[in-house]
Amino acid sequence: MSYFPTVDKVIYEGPDSDSPLAFRHYDADKRVLGKPMREHLRMAACYWHTFVWPGADMFGVGTFKRPWQRAGDPMELAIGKAEAAFEFFSKLGIDYYSFHDTDVAPEGSSIKEYRNNFAQMVDRLERHQEQSGIKLLWGTANCFSNPRFAAGAASNPDPEVFAYAGAQVFSAMNATQRLKGSNYVLWGGREGYETLLNTDLKREREQLGRFMRMVVEHKHKIGFKGDLLIEPKPQEPTKHQYDYDSATVFGFLHQYGLQDEIKVNIEANHATLAGHSFHHEIATAVSLGIFGSIDANRGDPQNGWDTDQFPNSVEEMTLATYEILKAGGFTHGGYNFDSKVRRQSLDDVDLFHGHVAAMDVLALSLERAAAMVQNDKLQQFKDQRYAGWQQPFGQSVLSGGFSLASLAEHAFANELNPQAVSGRQELLEGVVNRFIYT
């Protein structure tokens, strides 16, 4: 059975194509900076928004009528959903996918049913991967949707909820290992609070630290070679989440000695919810040595919530990709489309339209970012701007050659009177625009 009978395999047709089901910029094997586009971008389609979300929102029920979402036996529907997913991935020509445990298998009415259902579906996913060549970018566990997680998972006041979450993460990590996933993601959707009146912040932070230590220990026990990734988000669904942004996660990791074990998976829409630009969050993670992977999407600047729209700004994605290229590119991570079609985009073909357009945005952004790296005007300016720190005096300050008192004496003795120098922001914005709009 074909779930998308009206859609042929999406191919590269070039910039002059006007087909919404053809790539204008994503030429998978085209070499950029000595490496194929597909290897730079490592793009993935997510299971949850693409195949699980029914088109519901807080004010209305689902609008979609996907064949794998109809009423019926949950396991049979999960099997059909997997068939639809891999047909979609294959026709789209995307190399990776991502999932939560309960995206791919019904949770069932008991932990025993959960375990059995998930095990059966992992068997099927493994066969689909072998037959299609599609790979798993990352797996994760949904420890936020079930009512038992209303007060969190690892941060829950009930240790039995903590243990249940542990069972799910244990199962999802083992599945990710078996399916040769490149990363394992931990998103603390309800690891936070609604009110401080009933919350013990110190205790909940200690619980999270212990849980993450257990995850790290299990990674090494099973021999998982990929990255563990925390996905920062400031709020929603909770009022305040503990993994607020990359800098907050960095502090948490250092508190519990996990800074060499866990990195971050940065989502564009989460960055803006935290009051940051996507560019800022990537640059911050890179500077702190915890950059891992990307959830590619965008938010609506007029809405204060997570809209998870497909990325469509070449300017934004060029700057993001520039930072990633400068950092050496992805190691295990990639660009995962944590993006969903709009509630009024009812047709199955809309799933293709959203992904094709977004993949083209990333491909064009990669080319523009590569040009920026090859003729790195920004780095040249930064080198000049900070040149004083490469001189003997600057090097001595950084290496501990001065105390505060001797530094003050140096300033007094030499009657220092440094003057401000232009930061050339407008010039540099023009430089970036020339690369992007070539």
Curated annotation (Swiss-Prot):
Requisite cofactors: Mg(2+)
EC number(s) on file: 5.3.1.5
Residues involved in Mg(2+) 2 binding: E267, H270, D306, D308
Alphabetic keyword roster: Carbohydrate metabolism, Cytoplasm, Isomerase, Magnesium, Metal-binding, Xylose metabolism
Keyword Isomerase: yes
Active site feature: H100, D103
Presence of keyword Iron-sulfur: no
An example Gene Ontology molecular-function term: xylose isomerase activity
Residues binding Mg(2+) 1, per UniProt: E231, E267, D295, D338
Cofactor note (record): Binds 2 magnesium ions per subunit.
Reaction(s) catalysed by this chain's protein: alpha-D-xylose = alpha-D-xylulofuranose
Highest taxon listed in the record's lineage: Bacteria
Spans traversing the lipid bilayer: none
GO CC terms in record: cytoplasm
Family: Belongs to the xylose isomerase family.
HAMAP family per UniProt: Xylose_isom_A (MF_00455)
Subunit description: Homotetramer.
Name listed for the protein in its UniProt record: Xylose isomerase
